[in-house]
Amino acid sequence: MRASAVPEILAARLAQSDPPVSEYAVELVEGVVERRGEIDERIARYAEGWTLERMPPVDRNILRIAVLELLWRPDVPDRVAIDEAVELAKNLSTHRSPAFVNGLLASLVEGKGLATPAESTGRGSAVDSIPGQPS
């Protein structure tokens, strides 16, 4: 699917949705579409032995949402973003996916100078200190 088609598909689904799609879900989709290149770079950097194309599509998209939350949603504590991603992987993907998702996201958090997942209660200004990141 072309990234440029996502906004049109989202708008059509929102118009037909009953019950309505949450505002937060819409923000996540829009955020991933807007920052997909940056998000995919981060995933590729920490996906040891895997390319994005080789990952199961479900894992790839779970990771995209989690990376968006970890790096661009200071209102979401790191631990919550990681736990939710692991739960999604448990429920929607392969038996190996939860460990893969957890390991990749933990490495990303540690590698970017953010709090380790076990210690994280939020990021505060830590995200602002990431080189090349918008404040």
Swiss-Prot record:
It comes from the Bacteria. GO terms for cellular component: cytosol. One of its GO terms (biological process) is DNA-templated transcription termination. Keywords: RNA-binding, Transcription, Transcription antitermination, Transcription regulation. InterPro entries: NusB-like_sf (IPR035926), NusB_fam (IPR011605), NusB_RsmB_TIM44 (IPR006027). Residues 115-135 are annotated as: Disordered. GO terms for molecular function: RNA binding. Involved in transcription antitermination. Required for transcription of ribosomal RNA (rRNA) genes. Binds specifically to the boxA antiterminator sequence of the ribosomal RNA (rrn) operons. Belongs to the NusB family. This is Transcription antitermination protein NusB. It comes from Frankia casuarinae (strain DSM 45818 / CECT 9043 / HFP020203 / CcI3). The lineage of its organism: Bacteria, Bacillati, Actinomycetota, Actinomycetes, Frankiales. The gene is nusB.
